[in-house]
Curated annotation (Swiss-Prot):
The organism's taxonomic lineage, starting at the top: Eukaryota, Amoebozoa, Evosea, Eumycetozoa, Dictyostelia
UniProt source species: Dictyostelium discoideum
Entry keyword set: Coiled coil
Self-association state and partner proteins as the record states: Associates with translationally inactive ribosomes in the nonrotated state.
Region spans: Disordered: 1-146
GO molecular function list: transcription coactivator activity
Record's protein name: Coiled-coil domain-containing protein 124 homolog
Cellular component terms per the entry's GO annotation: nucleus
Length: 247
């Protein structure tokens, strides 16, 4: 009689196969580790060189990152300048140079206005820059040192306008230099630019009369005295606009 035959246990066979695979992988890993250890660098000089090279590469990456951030920041500033002034800026030009260029253009427009015959009806009211005069006075009272600013240019234009209206004459308002140039006409022989002498004339008048008014009104503050000085100046013969009105 033949021997008894038994079927194969599939689960046991699968377990043995997995166990053999795990053992094989472990042996391969040990072999790789052994080979890697054989090739591992142990020379301290070479190790230091590798370390420095790694640090150099990291520094280069950090510098590149900072450079990119600075570039993006500059682009953002240029965008803001473009939105504010309506035109792109040259990244090689500083803000100081941009302001210098604007000041130069303004002076050129003023020079062009001054070189043309003017119409006394034109009153220029500046919208960008103003001229102020500062007077410092020392007294023996409680206000030992007072300093006040008068906007001479603004007052000068208002006085010219008020005096011409009071005299029944025409007045042409100009908000900037370009408008004033467009309103200019021929010269009739009279002085057409009393405003050119206004600042110097007022300074001389103030220097001469302010100490007198301070002495005559010791109880008034400097601001009040200067207001009184200004009222007197409006009627003073030294005022160039009064000289124009008498011509």
């Amino acid at each position: 009689m033949g021997g008894k035959k038994f079927g194969t246990n599939s689960k046991a066979e699968e377990a043995r196969s997995k166990k053999a695979e795990v053992k094989k992988n472990e042996n391969e890993k040990k072999q790789r580790d052994k080979e890697d250890k054989m090739w591992e660098e142990t020379d301290t000089k070479i190790l230091d060189k590798q370390k420095k090279q790694k640090e150099k590469e990291e520094k280069a990456r950090e510098d590149a990152k900072k450079k990119q951030e600075a570039k993006e920041l500059l682009q953002q500033e240029d965008k803001e300048i473009k939105e504010r002034y309506g035109k792109p800026s040259d990244t090689k030009v500083t803000r100081f140079e941009i302001q210098q260029k604007r000041d130069k253009e303004q002076k050129q427009r003023e020079k062009e206005l001054a070189s043309r015959p003017s119409d006394p009806r034109v009153v220029v009211v500046p919208t960008t820059t103003t001229t102020t005069t500062t007077t410092t006075t020392t007294t023996t009272g409680s206000d030992d040192h007072e300093e006040e600013d008068f906007n001479l240019e603004e007052n000068m234009n208002h006085i010219l306008r008020e005096q011409r209206l009071k005299d029944g004459k025409d007045v042409i308002d100009a908000r900037d230099i370009n408008e004033a140039i467009g309103a200019l006409s021929g010269n009739d022989g009279k002085e057409q630019h009393p405003e050119r002498r206004m600042k110097a004339a007022f300074n001389a008048y103030e220097e001469e009369n302010l100490p007198v008014l301070r002495k005559e009104n010791p109880s008034l503050r400097l601001t009040q005295v200067k207001q009184l000085l200004w009222k007197n100046w409006l009627k003073a013969p030294e005022n160039p606009f009064n000289q124009v009105g008498s011509q």
